[in-house]
Amino acid sequence: MASNDTIADMLTRIRNACAVRHPTTKVPTTKMTRSIAQVLKQEGFIEDFSEAGEGVGKHLVISLKYKGKTRQPIITTLKRVSKPGLRVYSPCKDLPRVLGGIGIAIVSTSQGIMTDREARRQGVGGEVLCYIW
């Protein structure tokens, strides 16, 4: 099924896969989902990701990360902030701190997709896409 909000679709697929402890999940590939997956990997929320398929059927295979013998998911919450019907923009000085810095906010800036910490360091604001902790 085609989705108008690929970011929400990606977050939902990751959330559902973590809930049932799947080792991987597939997400349709776009530049935005690839960039978000890169940030998640850099921040240690996922193990790795790779592209599979060709043309229209191209997708990202995301390897999820768990901890301990009980395989508790590293990602406890994924929350979409800016939606197609209600965009949320924030200047550099007003970028949110997620759980006092424990979690991250993923921000789409003129410099690309990055975490709230990187955006503050570079002095740029942008669209707050989602919160993750």
Swiss-Prot record:
GO terms of molecular function: rRNA binding; structural constituent of ribosome
Transmembrane segments: none
GO cellular component: ribonucleoprotein complex; ribosome
Gene3D superfamilies: 3.30.1370.30, 3.30.1490.10
Claim: Transmembrane helix is one of the keywords in the record: no
GO terms (BP aspect): translation
Disulfide bonds: none
Pfam families linked: Ribosomal_S8
Keywords: Ribonucleoprotein, Ribosomal protein, RNA-binding, rRNA-binding
SUPFAM superfamilies: Ribosomal protein S8
InterPro entries named among the record's database cross-references: Ribosomal_uS8, Ribosomal_uS8_CS, Ribosomal_uS8_sf
Protein's job: One of the primary rRNA binding proteins, it binds directly to 16S rRNA central domain where it helps coordinate assembly of the platform of the 30S subunit.
Quaternary state and interactors: Part of the 30S ribosomal subunit. Contacts proteins S5 and S12.
HAMAP family named among the record's database cross-references: Ribosomal_uS8_B (MF_01302_B)
Similarity comment: family membership: Belongs to the universal ribosomal protein uS8 family.
Protein name: Small ribosomal subunit protein uS8
Organism for this UniProt entry: Gloeothece citriformis (strain PCC 7424) (Cyanothece sp. (strain PCC 7424))
Gene: rpsH
